[in-house]
């Protein structure tokens, strides 16, 4: 089987390191840098980008708009392959880009193609998360102010319109200013949620049939798994739910998997908490595991694994 020609790309905040056919060059993460990289690379080549949905997201979108085929390269694969291509285990931008190019060119390796729709969806989700964090920070400051003054506020949830209007009427200018910020952030978050819903594909909408999965959570799950092909066990491992063997000598056991997709893991964990409290099936399963002698933490892990199986059936079987 003929090898495909791949440009290996190691992306950073300010630079992109590219390697192909023994040539290596670094470019800036600007439009001019992207144009130079495309001109420098051989014609009709494919692009394998480490972090295509993170630091490499803008570059990936640019390449796709120019008609190039772009694939996502897993950072863990780079780490493993580095030991093969470098005797000393050298860690550099040159070595990483070279490894990505070499491994991606292997005909037996299958990579996930990056799509503009998924890039846009991930952009919106990331933006919303950023604004939600900012809103949480403002609310925490407001609550801390009330605690220091020994005042019991009229509202506990400062994300509601009534609570914000109440803040805007306060005599303290700092509280009024916080109310204005919260009002603006709420508008931005609501607008982003509408845009995310419009971008939601039909397959992601089917995930909302599972108790505890909202449209936003469904989009997050879909965006994290778009284009990937995996078994139930692989999906559980990818989401960080499946435990990792931790054995040494007579010691036998497992530990938590911290190498999975953390955003996906967070969503599944939140849904498992919701189901253990409000869903009859999830609650019964959770109680059953507790009766078997498992700890609350272990029982919730079991519930998360059951959720993984349900999500996998919708995403990869339907």
Report each predicted region and the residues it spans.
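Gly/Thr-rich phosphate-binding beta-strand-loop-beta motif of the actin/hexokinase/Hsp70
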Residues: 2-21, 100
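Nucleic-acid-processing active sites and adjacent nucleic-acid-binding tracks
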Residues: 21-46
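Phosphate-backbone recognition surface of nucleic-acid-processing proteins
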Residues: 32, 209, 215, 220-296
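Short alpha-helix plus adjacent loop in nuclease-associated cores
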Residues: 71-111, 251-259
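Glycine-rich, often acidic, oxyanion-interacting loops/wings at catalytic, nucleic-acid
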Residues: 125-206
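Acidic, carboxylate-rich catalytic segments that either coordinate divalent cations
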Residues: 281-318
